[in-house]
């Protein structure tokens, strides 16, 4: 297994929080910690007249969020690699902090391609 990928749809969120770039930066940072991930970099952008996009680069992969305050909606993506991370905890934190009244969470495992797994098991093979 490479890691776990969670796709989170948040509905009927607190509209003011969806448009608050500083709040979202803090919330994403805490979500990464709750997942047991290591935050390497965080970039956010606030759009006019409203909406924020945030991307957290993690040592283990990423967290992204795109908000539409006018409809109370946020699209969240959390992908973490390794057995020590818990992306669902990041999703739960984001859901709770944004006060989502409704949500949909889909998660699935990312698998190691067979050819890569074979190279990892064969020490004498070197990548080209």
UniProtKB/Swiss-Prot annotation:
It is an enzyme of class 4 (lyase). Belongs to the prokaryotic AdoMetDC family. Type 1 subfamily. Binds 1 pyruvoyl group covalently per subunit. The record marks 60-61 as: Cleavage (non-hydrolytic). This is S-adenosylmethionine decarboxylase proenzyme. NCBIfam families: SAM_DCase_Bsu. It catalyses: S-adenosyl-L-methionine + H(+) = S-adenosyl 3-(methylsulfanyl)propylamine + CO2. The modification Pyruvic acid (Ser) is found at residue 61. Keywords: Autocatalytic cleavage, Decarboxylase, Lyase, Polyamine biosynthesis, Pyruvate, S-adenosyl-L-methionine, Schiff base, Spermidine biosynthesis, Zymogen. PANTHER family: S-ADENOSYLMETHIONINE DECARBOXYLASE PROENZYME (PTHR33866:SF2). Is synthesized initially as an inactive proenzyme. Formation of the active enzyme involves a self-maturation process in which the active site pyruvoyl group is generated from an internal serine residue via an autocatalytic post-translational modification. Two non-identical subunits are generated from the proenzyme in this reaction, and the pyruvate is formed at the N-terminus of the alpha chain, which is derived from the carboxyl end of the proenzyme. SUPFAM superfamilies: S-adenosylmethionine decarboxylase. Heterotetramer of two alpha and two beta chains arranged as a dimer of alpha/beta heterodimers. The gene is speH. It comes from Synechococcus sp. (strain WH7803). GO terms for cellular component: cytosol. Disulfide bonds: none annotated.
